[in-house]
Amino acid sequence: MAHPLDLNQLAQHIKQWGQSLGFQQVGICDTDLTAEEPRLQAWLDKQYHGEMAWMARHGMLRARPHELLPGTLRVISVRMNYLPAKAAFASTLNNPELGYVSRYALGRDYHKLLRQRLKKLGDQIQHYCLEQNNLDRHDLELHDLEQHDSERQGQPEQHTASEINFRPFVDSAPIMERSLAAKAGIGWVGKHSLILNRDAGSWFFLGELLIDLPLPVDKPQEEQCGRCVACMTTCPTGAIVAPYTVDARRCISYLTIELEGAIPEEFRPLMGNRIYGCDDCQLICPWNRFSQLTDEDDFSPRAVLHTPQLLDLFAWNEEKFLRVTEGSAIRRIGHLRWLRNISVALGNAPYLDSIVLALETRRGLHPMLDEHIEWAISQQLARRATQAVEVQLPQKKRLIRAIEKGLPRDA
């Protein structure tokens, strides 16, 4: 007689396999995100998604993973640490002549690596279930020798390996990965809208494996932010407009990565030297005192992007930009937006003749870039005329102190 698949045992195997594949944590949840739909719709209605039209276009599909892969019963959520050694947070942010790149983008693009590991996890599950199914089939054949077929009529149908279907996702489809991660017990959603884990902070990537097995689910973690609003008060542009709510239109990550056109002038002075993304809301978070370094070589910083001189980066032509950023998440913004972002950072730097000269040599490449170059030159000349001394914004002063005191390993 065939035995049903032991799903509890399989769930334990999945977590062990996941850790052997380099994931620091694996959790399992169902697909029900109906509670998230009103919040998602309200966020879209307020236009907080900015020019990311695909978010509005996909609408509530993001909260319905079972529609992405029909038949999906569970989501296997994983996290993988990405914080590199010697992250140089404070030393880079505190030097206006350097360019700050969000630490997730210093190494190779994470999408392919995580997707491949998730595919391997799915293959292991499939292989295990096939083996179990073959054992069951062998038992059933032995049993059939002793029992007439008619005696087995009416027995409940067992889940067989041939029915298993899975699909990996890594920030590559309309799916609410943070809500799923929270539901799967990976962590809780912080007020900056990122997932926090009490043992690992927030410096990790998320990935999902949708599967049609009714695996046992994990319990969510209790939210541990309490009254803390450090991320909200530290955000340079005030993008965290309410607890758990980010107005992407104000977020430096959106402005430097997702926005294709001109960066609104009101935000440019607030961007400082951040040229690709922003980590401030993570850097100030007390839970990141417990962050763990990555053990993935692919996430190690490329030397040319680690504490880079702005003028050196600004001198890259398109060929060099494409060559240096091959396999990097940075490449997706293209050379034009790369120069746009660096122009803003140069405009925020202390006056130097070499900065003005470098900006002037880039005139005429594109009208959008020209507009940022003219702004940056005007900022430089105004600073020279007043002999202005750089004055750090209160949020930045507080952030640098917090990093040096709370994250000395990564300062």
From Swiss-Prot:
Relay the cofactor remark from the entry.
Answer: Binds 2 [4Fe-4S] clusters per monomer.
E.C. no:
1.17.99.6
Which residues are the active-site ones?
Answer: D171
Question: What is the enzyme's main class?
Answer: oxidoreductase
Q: Which residues bind [4Fe-4S] cluster 1?
A: C225, C228, C231, C285
What's its catalytic activity? epoxyqueuosine(34) in tRNA + AH2 = queuosine(34) in tRNA + A + H2O
Residues of the 4Fe-4S ferredoxin-type domain: 213-245
Q: What does this protein do?
A: Catalyzes the conversion of epoxyqueuosine (oQ) to queuosine (Q), which is a hypermodified base found in the wobble positions of tRNA(Asp), tRNA(Asn), tRNA(His) and tRNA(Tyr).
Subunit organization:
Monomer.
Q: Which family, according to UniProt?
A: Belongs to the QueG family.
**PANTHER family on file:** EPOXYQUEUOSINE REDUCTASE
Q: Please state what the protein is called.
A: Epoxyqueuosine reductase
Provenance organism: Yersinia pestis
